[in-house]
Amino acid sequence: MKCQRVLTYLRIFGTTMFGISLLVGISTAYIMGYQFFTTAHNHLSFGLYGAILVVHLIIQSLFALLEHRNMRRSLETPIKLNKSLALCIAAYQEDPNYLKKCLVSVKRLTYPGIKVIMVIDGNSEDDMYMMEIFKEVMGWDNSATFVWQSNYHIKSPEETDESYAESLQHVSRLVLSNRFVCIMQKWGGKREVMYTAFKALGRTMDYVQVCDSDTMLDPASSVEMVKVLEEDPMVGGVGGDVQVSKLHFYFSVRYWMAFNIERACQSYFGCVQCISGPLGMYRNSLLHEFLEDWYNQTFMGSHCSFGDDRHLTNRVLSLGYATKYTARSKCLTETPITYLRWLNQQTRWSKSYFREWLYNSMWFHKHHLWMTYEAVITGFFPFFLIATAIQLFFQGRLWNILLFLLIVQAVALIKSSFASCLRGNIVMVFMSFYSVLYMSSLLPAKMFAIATINKSGWGTSGRKTVVVNFIGLVPITIWFTILFIGIIYTIIQQTKKTFPQSEEIVLIVGAVVYASYWVILLTLYTVLIKKCGKRKKEAHYDMVLDV
């Protein structure tokens, strides 16, 4: 026991020093600006910091490839489908069409005897349509339903202590004695909804799968995730490949990259940072080891009501269990179709990322060093990028601004080209479009998320009643103002001094290259997507989900 404690302390010390050394090393390389080579008049250069980022991308891609190879090998692994499994669906003001498609896909799951519990966040007349859809799809005779005036943590004023206690028992009996259950309860947020499903199930299930009400599941999705948990008892949770059901190009290619490169790499080392809400599965025995702590999570004195899935994943990691990703398990989900809703979603996700980064750092020593390495690289990269942008925009040289834009698109094109080769689809090249969204919107949204990290809420409204929130435009406006001032400052500085002919030539060539890049990319987009690649929405489901 004493020896084990010493080893734990040594691991804590080792991972801490590794993380600090890595951050100090990267910061030093950035601040010193050491250059391996530079051209005359400093038009082009390649430094140590750039080399670090290139090596990171190469290593990340390599391990992602190795993990995909492991996934293909798992096809040969036979499993017994004899473990009990419950699917928990969280619903909140969902679009009726999305909800119906979700439930139809649930009925088509191939895992035998799966129990389905849908908990609706809200119990008013306006929410009743979701329960009606549940009964219609799952079967009027097969569905057990209950409209609860309270929830597990808030007692309705209309209930007495005795009736509240009876309601708690009734919810548990309903869930345990029926296969298809729908519960409407007092509004409390997504975490409250998930808690109800987990608590009512108790320890009666072997595995618990989570799903959002806008998600359409592949029939084999549950089987493939069970396979991962069955292969290794030290895997505590697993997530699948979340794809975008609407043909919204920028999001679909970005989702593919995030899951099949970034999370696949994390999965190779058993430390996936977030098992997504639309498609995830956990060992039920682990859930009940931290259920109360997960629900009662606080940050800066406030109860946390967002980042539920990421914190659930981190709780599994905190116990020393691995978290995995499998591309064999798939689903389709909806993404915000308007810019403001997307921005609010990204801000909410960024809040949970930075908050959970701090929590996650306490468990680095329980996992592979890659977990520490990637946390440092991805956690601090936005700050280095913002510093670089501001520095180049305020150096008083137009070429620096143009070079920054060229490098951003060059890196995006390299990453998207690799994704095209891996996926075998030229469509992935258009992921380079996403770099514009990242630089113009996601970066300032991340900073805004840090500034408002203790603000709670769902972050986005339900789909049936869309509420537009313009607060996300504040950091975007500030960011564009800073960059605009930098451009004006640079133009003024350039007019004060003689413009070298070599600089003029480089500027013209760079501008032509940048403009040509966008002309070619937009032309390809028009040809491949708008004409040749245009498909009906239903065709996207033909592969596995023609619902």
Which residues make up each language-model segment?
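Helix-loop boundary elements of multi-pass alpha-helical membrane proteins
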Residues: M1-R11, M71, L75-T77, K366-W370, ...
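Loop-to-transmembrane boundary segments
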Residues: K2-M17, D95, H365-F380, S461-I485
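N-proximal low-complexity "stem/linker" segments adjacent to membrane-targeting elements
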Residues: K2-V104
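Short hydrophobic helices that act as membrane-entry/anchoring signals
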Residues: T8-R11, T15-F18, H56, Q60, ...
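Alpha-helical transmembrane segments of integral membrane proteins, especially early/N-terminal helices
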Residues: T8-S21, T338-R341, H367-H368, R397-L403
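Membrane-embedded multi-pass helical conduit in multi-pass membrane proteins
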Residues: S27-L48, A375-G457, G472-V547
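Non-transmembrane catalytic domains and loops of membrane-associated enzymes and transporters
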Residues: M71-F381, Y541-V547
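Cytosolic, membrane-interface loops and tails of multi-pass inner-membrane proteins
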Residues: Y353-W357, S456-S461
